[in-house]
Amino acid sequence: MRLDSFPASISVPYEVRSGFQAQGGLPSPSGHTSLRVSVFDSCFCTEVLPHGMYPVYLTGILTDLHEEHSQSSFLGINFRDGDKRSQLADVLREYNVPVIDYPRHFEGCPVLPLSLIQHFLRVCEHWLSTGNNQNIILLHCERGGWPSLAFMLSCLLIFKKLQSAEHKTLDLIYREAPKGFLQLFSALNPMPSQLRYLQYVARRNISPEWPPMERALSFDCLILRAIPSFDSDNGCRPLVRIFGRNIIGKNASTSNMIFSMPKKKTLRHYRQEDCDVIKIDIQCPVQGDVVLECVHLDLDPEKEVMMFRIMFNTAFIRSNVLMLNSDDIDIVWGSKDQYPRNFRAEMLFCELGGISPARPPTATLNGDMKGGLPIEAFSAVQELFNGVDWMESSDNAAFWLLKEFSANSLQEKFQKLILSDMEELSKFQAKVGLQIPLMSPLDSDEEKYSVASDSVSSSEHEKVQPGGNSSDSENINHDLTTEDTASMGNVLVNTPSVLPPTTPPPCGSLSILSTDENQLPPEVQHESPSDRKLPSPSPTAAAPPPPPPPPPPPSGNKPAFSPPPPPPPPPPPPLPQSNYASSQPPPPPPPPPLPNCLVPSPPPPPPPPPILPNRSVPPPPPPPPPLPNHSVLPPPPPPPPPPSLPNRLVPPPPAPGIGNKFPAPPPPPPPPRSSSRTPTGAATSSKGPPPPPPPPLPPANRTNGPGVPSAPPPPPPPPPANRSNGPSAPAPPLPPPLPAAANKRNPPAPPPPPLMTGKKAPAPPPPPPQAPKPPGTVPPPPPLHGASGRPHPPSSKGLNAPAPPPLLGRGREATGSAKGRGIGLAQQSNPPKKASLKPLHWVKVTRAMQGSLWEDAQKQGNQARAPDIDLSELESLFSTAVATNASEKGGTKRGSAISKPEIVHLVDMRRANNCEIMLTKIKMPLPDMINAILALDTSVLDNDQVENLIKFCPTKEEIEMLKNYNGNKEMLGKCEQFFLELMKVPRVESKLRVFAFRITFSTQVEELRTNLTTINDATKEVKESLKLRQIMQTILTLGNALNQGTARGSAVGFRLDSLLKLSDTRARNNKMTLMHYLCKLLSEKLPELLDFDKDLIHLEAASKIQLKLLAEEMQAINKGLEKVEQELAASVNDGAISVGFREALKSFLDAAEAEVRSLISLYSEVGRNADSLAQYFGEDPARCPFEQVTSILVIFVNMFKKSRDENARTAELEKKKLEKDKEKATLSAKKVLE
């Protein structure tokens, strides 16, 4: 046999399986690794060699080992079953190889006690560190010992710091065996308990003394939250057994069963529909390693089904509580779905000196104590309530209570209280554990661990006779103490080196003996438990009102060829589209460009001005280029059309090529009636259909513009009436055909609004500016000299005529040359880019309502004219870019700002901005902040700031990104600098979470302690109130008086929810309830009982507390302490940066553990008192939890007080009425006498 490589398959069973690498613990192809630990392949096989073949197999392997590793010494470690002598020890003794035998389980769990784990680790560490680092350890296990061998090997890897992750290490070793190999030897999944002990090993750096001293504790109770399903009723009948060291009996060093519930048919059955909490009182002292088994006892007492198993050590129970979920307990393979998702096992402990004495049974209200009034006092009630049925109490108090309060304001509260998880409930078990005698000793109740070395040979001791010489052996009782471990180390140190088999010197054989353990785990059985689519809007509703005519705002523009909604009547026509617009969406019509007729003949006429919408708006124009913010201002009023001029003033045709590419100006708004004036200027070609027009003008009044062949006529203005032609989808509706007399070759220009009769046109406004050219269009030539003599468009008198929009993109000169006039100035299109104005975020009105001031402003003309606005002043005050004063700041600073290198951002900009905002709230340098975190200084950082720091801890991707950045780190942004500072601290997020827990710990503990104290006080007040006791007895006597002679009579007590029915039972006159009668009776007979509510001052506050929430808070505190403990252990390897952090955390942990320990004691006491309160009223805590008891009592107290006050008011009114009647009688008597 050779150790050169691993076998290709596990099916080759008997070879030495070579060790595990020092890095990562992975199998190495070479037989000699730094760990120098080898595992026999027989440990991975289920086959059994025929009798006599096993020594031959071992002899062959050992011969090869001595040949290949002649300079090495070997140590054999065997995990054996029971106390019988192993064949491995017999064979290895012949080669002078010492063997240590360990048990393969502890009370059925494949985890060895912590003292044996410590012994194993020290032995391995000592052996591997001697012999010039050439010694080798041979691991072997007998049949069924693989789970223990894998666990101990994992402990060694973590102890030697070759692995750090417990779960990964254990899983890594288990994967060396065939799939399903672990399930063959363990009916339960042992990994949760094994991981718990691996964590014990991994946390050895927390305290200089490891393992810590095993504390003697009293196991108070076991609480199971959320009932697991192990039968057809979705419930279970749990039976708990505890194995460990009997610290009270004579054999304190041996392990046996120290607690067991009575195995009887009357064992309580818990169902999920009845309750969700199982509480089992244990009251058993424990110390050291403890195994807890919970089995489900079927109706057949002999049939047990294993539910779960937990193994733990009391030395690592820091806060007297151990809370585990379904992932932390050993359960049957594949039974995870039998446990609810929120299942939790809580084990509560207290100090051994504080173990509670055996509690007497809780005194109930309806016991031997008598009180209240005799039944003779209720003679009147039988007549008063004769014929009124005393309501039967339901068997299900919770259901009845929910139904009873479904019609009042407390319905929601009681639904939550009754139907929610019922907490801290289980059938009261009065000191079951202390009344059960210990079971008869089994064969394996006592285990003896002994180390044999150099003593006289005997029949009970192992014998080594190499070369015919007998070696002495000495039997040393091993009681699992540290001293014995040290002695074992000394024995191994003195062990001589291995010599050839022919002449080996005498050598001690090391063996840890244990009695044969024939007790098998209980039989494990498993039983299975039984767009909404939004409606499409109509075309009319889908389209919002179109924007006003040019210049339009960017957000309201749509392509002219998109399907428009029916235009609102009367719509003004949109801009005619050019050939360019037919292939792609054209730009929006800017302020009117120079007309097509500018080129051939001077002087060119000014273009038509923008259209002012009157009562309707056209379909949206094509999307425009980006406009400045102030382009959303209201549209200006239209400039007046040109006056009627002679034919000689008609402009010449446009230049060639312009008519097909340049968009035509929009027509002026329609007149209220037909106009005889003829406009100037020629229309351009338009391919897009215009919106519905008004009736066409007479052909005789139109003058055609020459030079535009075969161009369709532009749309005329819409009519004033609310009529419109039907639209044709998807394009806007076409205008009606022109009159027959119209010239088809030369279409007429759109008509302007008529001049008002008898009015004289004012002076013409300045010419319009030039609009920015859309792509693909040919810019028109500039205006010719002498344009001042060109005709100007007039306006009707009385109308506010603003100037055409200024030139776009021409800077301040263009803007300043055209001063605004009234409302028309507000609709500037594309102001200069150098002076972008801040927007006024108003809600624009696109259609003036009839009778509004906006409509009046358009009609009044100059009377309501707004003052002229100086745009230069407006730009200097409301410019988006801060204007710089050249005389003050100069150009040098501007140049330096441009040359300044840009900040490098590696993190997402949104996250970086949020991080910088967060950092501005923490006003301190980053190094100081890191020092405050490491010092756990709560005076510098509060909880909110720490939580924000946790949110902005760098992710793995961000850390890699920053590590790979090779540029100048000083040029990184603030967020990146912050991340770099955090990266200097190992596990900074974990430290921040510990810091956050440190900040909130005091508040959490104080709030929890206050709530627990409130429950205790309320329970004590209720149970010690003599007045409440007498009132309950009075109610019992009252009910028996009403039910006398019926099946409901002669009751010895009543259910607690019957208190709520006192107000539902009314007298025959319907003026009084039984609650009123009770108060009346007490006020007459026992008035001192009326103020019994003063004895229950904490009852209402306790009714608002839920034990389930308290349990969750307790678990959160306990988990937080575990995280603190883990971080403290991990920070040992951080170096100097975490020295102060470890000191501060260790100080906090010591104080916090003491605080939580006292809190756990109070929490356990509260649980017992909450159960006893239900038992005080004769209720089952599982069916009537503490929350329901207190809520019923609070409601009863409030109803009693209300009835008492109503009786007092009624008595006062009757008294006044009697006084008035008496006065009337006196007056009547006087009148009679007179």
Curated annotation (Swiss-Prot):
Residues 214-352 form the C2 tensin-type domain. GO terms for molecular function: phosphoprotein phosphatase activity. Residues 1-208 form the Phosphatase tensin-type domain. Residues 827-1226 form the FH2 domain. Gene3D superfamilies: 2.60.40.1110, Formin, FH2 domain (1.20.58.2220), Protein tyrosine phosphatase superfamily (3.90.190.10). The active site is at residue 141. Residues 498-507, 536-576, 584-656, 663-673, 688-699, 709-721, 729-739, 762-784 have a biased composition (Pro residues). It comes from the Eukaryota. Residues 524-534 have a biased composition (Basic and acidic residues). Keywords: Hydrolase, Protein phosphatase. Coiled coil: none annotated. PANTHER family: FORMIN-J, FORMIN-LIKE PROTEIN 14. This is Formin-like protein 3. It comes from Oryza sativa subsp. japonica (Rice). The lineage of its organism: Eukaryota, Viridiplantae, Streptophyta, Embryophyta, Tracheophyta.
